[in-house]
Amino acid sequence: MATKTSNLGHLLLSLFILLLFILSQVGVAQAKRLQQRNKLRLDCVPLPPPPPPLRGIVKPPIASFHSASPKDKGP
């Protein structure tokens, strides 16, 4: 009798593990399919044009240092 119970326990445990494995594989397949669907959906939507440049922003001047060479001194 103990052997039958042990075999039944192993059978139920094996079936439970098999069920978990199948459910995990189904979940992985659904995730891949959803990811591909989202990727295709994003490929079909055109990107909006970039915003126009702001004209109110003044660019800082580029620093120019005077040369110390003799030809720039003048008369």
UniProtKB/Swiss-Prot annotation:
A Gene Ontology term for the protein's cellular component: apoplast
Alphabetic keyword roster: Apoplast, Cell membrane, Cleavage on pair of basic residues, Membrane, Secreted, Signal
Segments carrying motif SCOOP motif: 61-75
Disulfide-linked positions: none
Signal peptide feature range: 1-31
Summary of the knockout phenotype: Increased growth and fresh weight.
GO molecular function per UniProt: LRR domain binding; receptor serine/threonine kinase binding
Induction: Accumulates upon infection by generalist herbivores such as Spodoptera littoralis. Induced by wounding. Triggered by salicylic acid (SA).
Gene Ontology terms: biological process: defense response; defense response to bacterium; response to herbivore; response to insect; response to salicylic acid; response to wounding
Location (main, coarse): membrane
Self-association state and partner proteins as the record states: Interacts with MIK2 (via extracellular leucine-rich repeat domain); this interaction triggers the formation of complex between MIK2 and the BAK1/SERK3 and SERK4 coreceptors, and subsequent BAK1 activation by phosphorylation.
Purpose of the protein: Brassicaceae-specific phytocytokine (plant endogenous peptide released into the apoplast) perceived by MIK2 in a BAK1/SERK3 and SERK4 coreceptors-dependent manner, that modulates various physiological and antimicrobial processes including growth prevention and reactive oxygen species (ROS) response regulation. Inhibits root growth. Prevents general growth and development. Exhibits antibacterial effects against Pseudomonas syringae pv. tomato DC3000, Ralstonia solanacearum, Bacillus subtilis and Agrobacterium tumefaciens, thus being an antimicrobial peptide (AMP).
Family label: Belongs to the serine rich endogenous peptide (SCOOP) phytocytokine family.
Protein name according to UniProt: Serine rich endogenous peptide 4
Record organism: Arabidopsis thaliana (Mouse-ear cress)
